[in-house]
Amino acid sequence: MKKLFLGQFVPIFLTLITFLVLSTILYGILIVLNSMHLSVPIVLDFRKREVLIGMSIYLKTAIDFAIFMGNLMHANPGWKKRVAIEIGTAVGNGIGTFLVLIVWTLFKEVPILMIIMIFIASVVLLRMAEESLEEFLKQKKSFIQIRMPVGLLQDQLNFVNTLFRPILRFFVPNLNLTNAKKLSFANLIVFSFTIPFILGLDDFAGYIPLFSVINVFGFALGVMLGHMILTMGLFAFPKITVKVVKHPFVLIVGALAFIGIGLYGFWESAKILLSII
């Protein structure tokens, strides 16, 4: 009973507390932004519609996050390590959300900043897609019929990622999606912060157009609520999560999701660049 309490209830309770703390910080940030006499003040209210839209946008990367977190939990067992993973992933997701709001509010007239962030995030996502396909190819008895096209796709990704290796090394020197390493408590917090933060940056492409038609406060709450619900599910059923994220079908779908989001990010970067030339 004690093991169950420490292994599941404590991390899940901490997930809820972290959500409430980050929501309070979000509210405070929006108050500060409103104090700057913006041309269009931010409405500090929300409706269910905005919250649901935010959750939907977040869950677009749910497969990606589940793969990352499931492998991280598998490589770092124990309730203390789960606490570190929760803190890192929640703060990473929260800060990514805050950054989207701040950049949109203060720097929407400086599109070059958005181009750089979207481009870097897209490069990282292609590297993560390659690692998913590498893990799939290691499972030699699964989905034999599609191993050849998957191998060809993995080779193409390897070629592209080789070109971008300096960028990958500079921003995420130890990024590895499917072979997470055992880390200390402090290092685990830092590492588990990185991927949710990077995935959040790539969502600039989807977030920014929405901010002109929806309430950003409700949208941001929805993003963080989606993260909280997904994290609780992962903590409540860790063994199932590990089996699921190692399944060949999930690896393929996750890789395709990474590629799709990454290519969309490149497309959005090009569109923004062409609009300012």
Question: What label would you give each PLM region?
Answer:
Residues 1-277:
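Multi-pass alpha-helical transmembrane bundle typical of ion/small-solute transporters
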